Amino acid sequence: MKTFLRHQLERYAQRLGELDFLLSREDIMSDMAQYRTISREHAEITQIAGRYERYKQREADIAGAAEMLEDPDMAEMAREEIAAAQAELVQLEEELQRLLLPKDPDDARNAFLEIRAGTGGDESALFAGDLLRMYTRYCERAGWRCEVVSESESELGGYKEVVIRIAGNDVFGRLRFESGGHRVQRVPATETQGRIHTSACTVAVLAEPDETVAVQINPADLRIDTYRASGAGGQHINKTDSAVRITHIPTGIVAECQDDRSQHRNKAKALQVLSARIQEKDRSERAAKDAAMRKGLIGSGDRSDRIRTYNFPQGRLTDHRINLTLYKLQAIMEGDLGDVLDALRAAREAEQLAELESSLPA
């Protein structure tokens, strides 16, 4: 284990003793607000300290087993004990590193996932449909619930734009690094010469705000327009003005929904998306300020960042941020995204660990 990690863990062990003492004091117990704050910190540190105690115990087990290696009768058992303890130490160190990393409270939230067709015309819209299928299949594997919030279909199938809401455990934390430009290289269905075309879509993953964030939008800052819902190619599918478009005047951010026959429900969904987009704008601005100080490996999640290429002739997916290449594109398009998302999380955790090391006193 790295020295700085061990020092940080020792500080947590010391802090746990301090918290135990504080929680035993009558003046703390009589102040419920302070008691709850200290109790929350105590619960968080107890988990870290418990895993660290187990880590030190397994280190001691290895030292004890090493002393038995000189005994022919005990050597085989000692080697087995050392191997088992070393394997557990690796796992414990990974757990401890993750526990020490800063937590983003938004990671546990539900999310809105937006896909927009970009360069490439009809082929881009078809690829947007393929991405939607990929993400919904992954959500099924993860046990998450998906619902379409708004969609604008293209004439040949696919989507000019589609927004879905995903509900489940740790949705935003798992999908947040999908934001950016997704490029596809393949022979389009409309191509008669067999030539490979390149087109692109943009994806944005937005944490769903809680109600306290949503109600902070001033109604006076909103312009709400209603219109008739329409299908592919502009064909009207509803004779009433049930579709809703909401504009946040100070920022110019727009959200619309026409998925439901009820104007009231469409308005509620559009407000949810609008709130998420406003929150994401604030998050992006903060990320841009951070990026001015350091260039993150994963990137800011801006739509303009080209993050990934899907090469169908080669069956290849490449994530350009972490130089990850996988030759299992068909499986990935069917929702097998786990390897990609795990690699992105590992890269981000490595970044955070380096930041933690540089921020701690020597």
From Swiss-Prot:
Keyword terms, alphabetized: Cytoplasm, Methylation, Protein biosynthesis
GO molecular function terms listed in the Swiss-Prot or TrEMBL record: translation release factor activity, codon specific
N5-methylglutamine: residues bearing it: 235
Modification after translation, per record: Methylated by PrmC. Methylation increases the termination efficiency of RF1.
InterPro entries: PCRF, Pep_chain_release_fac_I, Pep_chain_release_fac_I_sf, Prokaryotic/Mito_RF, RF-1
Keyword Cytoplasm: yes
GO CC terms: cytoplasm
Subcellular location per the Swiss-Prot or TrEMBL entry: Cytoplasm
Chief subcellular location: cytoplasm
Entry keyword rRNA-binding: no
Family: Belongs to the prokaryotic/mitochondrial release factor family.
Function as written in the Swiss-Prot or TrEMBL entry: Peptide chain release factor 1 directs the termination of translation in response to the peptide chain termination codons UAG and UAA.
Protein name: Peptide chain release factor 1
Organism: Variovorax paradoxus (strain S110)
